[in-house]
Amino acid sequence: MNQLQNLAEALSASSPVSGTVQTVVDGNTTTTTTTNTGLGVVAVGAGLAMIGAIGSGLGQGYAAGKTVEAVGRNPEMISKIRATFIIGAGIAETASIYSFIVALLLIFVGK
């Protein structure tokens, strides 16, 4: 039970903070509630967005290894192999670029 209480306290520390503002205009009272998502929640989201770069990195490493093997087997075809590898690496890199853009948007816009 103590672990659940610790987890609940940790989650409440990173939960959005809300505040209430009361405005009086011409005798009328208006209550407005504001919510501020903490920077901690945004940072966790940005970190999770960068998980998309893991698959891209693994795929590019595997492709580079296979490219070296192909050049080792047939050195005369290096120009065609290189061109194919560069195109494939560019396509594989798009996932990590999109993940990075999402992380930047969360950090700078998601406050």
From Swiss-Prot:
TM spans (from-to): 38-58, 89-109
Protein location: Cell membrane
InterPro entries: ATP_synth_csu_bac/chlpt, ATP_synth_F0_csu, ATP_synth_F0_csu_DDCD_BS, ATPase_proteolipid_c-like_dom, F/V-ATP_Csub_sf
Gene3D superfamilies given in the database record: lithium bound rotor ring of v- atpase (1.20.120.610)
Site (Reversibly protonated during proton transport): 93
Family: Belongs to the ATPase C chain family.
Subunit structure: F-type ATPases have 2 components, F(1) - the catalytic core - and F(0) - the membrane proton channel. F(1) has five subunits: alpha(3), beta(3), gamma(1), delta(1), epsilon(1). F(0) has three main subunits: a(1), b(2) and c(10-14). The alpha and beta chains form an alternating ring which encloses part of the gamma chain. F(1) is attached to F(0) by a central stalk formed by the gamma and epsilon chains, while a peripheral stalk is formed by the delta and b chains.
Protein name: ATP synthase subunit c
Source lineage: Bacteria, Bacillati, Mycoplasmatota, Mycoplasmoidales, Metamycoplasmataceae
Membrane topology value: Multi-pass membrane protein
Keyword set, alphabetical order: ATP synthesis, Cell membrane, CF(0), Hydrogen ion transport, Ion transport, Lipid-binding, Membrane, Transmembrane, Transmembrane helix, Transport
Superkingdom field: Bacteria
GO terms under cellular component: plasma membrane; proton-transporting ATP synthase complex; proton-transporting two-sector ATPase complex, proton-transporting domain
Stated role: F(1)F(0) ATP synthase produces ATP from ADP in the presence of a proton or sodium gradient. F-type ATPases consist of two structural domains, F(1) containing the extramembraneous catalytic core and F(0) containing the membrane proton channel, linked together by a central stalk and a peripheral stalk. During catalysis, ATP synthesis in the catalytic domain of F(1) is coupled via a rotary mechanism of the central stalk subunits to proton translocation.
GO MF term (any one): lipid binding
